[in-house]
Amino acid sequence: MDNSRRGFIRKAAISGTALIAAPAFLGASEKSKSNKLAAAEQPFKLKYAPYFGMFEEHAGKDLGDNVKFCHDMGFRAMFDNGIMNRPVDDQVKIANALQKLGMDLGPFVLYADFSVTSFVLNKPETREMLISKMKEGVEVAKRINGKWALVVPGRYDERLHREFQTANVIDNLRYCCDILEPAGIVMVLEPLNTLHDHPGLFLNRIPQAYEICRAVNRPSCKIVDDIYHQQITEGNLIPNIEAAWSEIAAFHLGDNPGRNEPSTGEINFKNIFKYIYSRNYTGVLCMEHGSSLKGKEGEARVIQAYREADSFEV
């Protein structure tokens, strides 16, 4: 599986795959598998959010059926990184399907160009580009009832001191907030690891993102904490979540190594989820990872892995 953000966006935009409820496609010979999936129909304690296409081995192509299947499996949110690239009709269809079932939509990618320096620059043309992007994101958010928009501040400039770059990022984020805040949209900044997946990016650690959000000092500038990336960059996951709690608005999930479902790597998701739940968190946790097994078995295992990690005592 492509571990990069671009891989997830590309898959979401191209596949558009959807899911159907288990009884609609499983025959008598697969009764035991049907029962296993049906056992996951109780709602999860937290709003874990599959992406469109995550269960494509069980799927047709209807986006509404995709939403319904996830709801039947106990999920109360979904996410679609590439929803800005979908046709308007599909955007509206997703929004209506989620609204009908009372489900949330996690952060969509508004700006994440990994190939250029952008937020780190103090240039009028850069600012104009970012403002234009934010306005485009507002229009999409209106159609999809979007609450959160994901932003990656781009690459680090090797010819400019980091402190100057940080100041420029803060200024540019404030300009973005001027556009997003009146529309009720929260921009979430994502630190990404530079060791394995994204060398050269400016923002890579939760403490760094926290410092920037505190400096921007706007309610529309927060953090999406990607557990997979932060295990690689700094570890110490629960203490860092606790320290940055006031600035965290969303989570991304994935075990490490491998970036697959919980229990396939070194991260204790059950304890992490218990802590997040204890903070009365009502936001979305996007399942931005692959599956350790292929086919229908792998998809069933993903759901079961979340059942196991969600079985913490309250």
For each of these PLM feature ranges, what is it?
Residues 65-83:
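Catalytic domains of carbohydrate-active enzymes, especially glycoside hydrolases
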Residues 79-99, 153-157, 197:
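Glycine-rich, proline-tolerant flexible connector loops at the mouths of alpha/beta enzymes
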Residues 2-71, 145, 203-225, 229-314:
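Histidine-acidic metal/acid-base catalytic patches
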Residues 85-102, 133-143, 170-181, 238-243:
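Short amphipathic alpha-helices and their capping/turn segments at secondary-structure boundaries
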Residues 11-24, 37-42, 120-222, 313:
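Active-site acidic/histidine proton-transfer and metal-coordination neighborhood
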Residues 54-56, 84, 111-114, 155-157, ...:
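Active-site-proximal loop/turn and secondary-structure-junction residues that shape catalytic pockets
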